[in-house]
Amino acid sequence: MDPILKLQNGSDVRGVAVEGVADEPVTLTPEYANRIVQAFVLWLSKKSGKKASELKIAVGHDSRISAPMLKQQALMAIVAQGATAVDCSMATTPAMFMSLVYEETKYDGSMMITASHLPFNRNGIKFFEPENGGMEKKDLTDMLKIACELTEQIADISSVEKFDLVSLYAENLCTKIREGINSKDNYDKPLTGNHIVVDAGNGAGGFFAQKVLAQLGADTTGSLYLDPDGHFPNHIPNPENKEAMDAIRGAVLNNKADLGLIFDTDVDRMSAVFSDGQEVNRDALIAMMAAILVKDYPNSTIVTDSVTSDKLTAFLEGELHLKHHRFQRGYKNVINECKRLNEEGVVSPLAIETSGHGALKENYYLDDGAYMAVKLLIAAAKTKAEGKILNSLIEKLEPQFETAEYRLKLKGEDFKAYGAKVLEAFTARAKEKGYHIVTPNYEGVRISFKGEANGWALLRQSLHDPNMPLNVEGNGEGDCAKITAMMKELLSGFDQLDISVFDK
């Protein structure tokens, strides 16, 4: 296989961009980046029906140390193919998508140089085009095949236009907050009197404190890691990471803040912390966004990934009277399912993963952490005006008691096929034991337990890697361990499945 094709990771390009980690040679070289972006220009020209010379394509990046090098290659590739390049410098993934939408820009295509929360030596590219937004997996495969046939091209980029996209993006977020709160006392600075801290994890999200919250009157004293630093010296910029959540929780409590917001590196994900230190991530974040949307979309369908809790379903369906459509892992999967439902006449305002990727129909189905933060801030102001606190929106969501996740390694070349055999045998064994297999189910095998142990387990194949994730949730003392033991029994005896993780 051509090494360029190996850089595909779902609908993104991902690879090792700089040396610095043992046994991880550079795979996303400057030359490969150049050829891949050239291929994007050619692919976009064909798709849009425009000549390359008629295309205007924007490039943005996060704080990674390899970003300047990759940006230079991207700009040269665009110019070499005859298109007009725009340098947006430090930006966010959602902002790069919105550059196709804003009247001030309306570019023909854009790209974000990022590898989300991965280590400092990694990088990648996300591509956007106006018709479908983010590129689909098949389209990226086709584009990379074009790149395999190209050679590196050098071009003069000294006169490339520079545009401060993040400032335009921030202005639009400020407008949405002002309109959403519609304060009669202080329309321009509706967050006056609120203390809100941000943890940007040294990624690209620091602008939210400076260009959004502060502009709207909020006190952001105590915010963390707003300065971009591609070495990520403080913690992994990932709202799923315990150390990261501990940091923003500490910032909220130590500064007696009203709310804490935390973003990943490229700001397409977020989580939050209430004033009392309660974390609003995973199931709680999904519940919160659904509770915010329910007034405008009663009886609608919320699409989530597959690893959500039964307790979330009980809250969405029992308390909010919504429908919970538990689908698959992968933010593109949940977004595309949400689109499909709406196209078929099923009202679905939200597609969201436990990872913090959340996309709203009202916002172009764009997974945008900053936009979710905007919705949260508006909701906080409205609940405050009603004499309530933000926590009250999800106070009836039962907290998870105990959870565990295991990644069982698959050996051999054709790990996908072997994983499918494991799932088939696992299902048969579960039925023989009389376990309750949940249906409908759209990914892997989900088993619900009531009686000797209470909770659930989900075994599935990883989207890209040679392993099988197993998620377990127990509802009471000892339930998680009991369910895990039952899973271990069902998964014993497969010669290419490593279950030693259970013994660690």
Describe every region a protein language model picked out.
Residues M1-A74, Q81, S158-G193:
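An N-terminal, well-structured beta->alpha segment
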Residues L5-A22, A200, A204, L350-T354, ...:
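Conserved phosphate/anionic-ligand binding catalytic regions in large, soluble enzymes, centered on
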Residues L42, K46, K50, K56-R122, ...:
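N-terminal small/polar loop signature for handling phosphorylated ligands or for N-terminal nucleophile
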Residues G49-D62, V86, H195-V197, S300-S306, ...:
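Short glycine-rich phosphate-binding loop at a beta-alpha junction
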Residues C88-S89, T93, L144-T175, F274-T354, ...:
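Proline/glycine-rich low-complexity loops and linkers
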Residues E104, N121-V252:
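Gly/Ser/Thr-enriched, mixed-charge loops and adjacent short helices
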Residues Y297-N471, G476-K504:
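Phosphate-binding and adjacent anionic-ligand microenvironments
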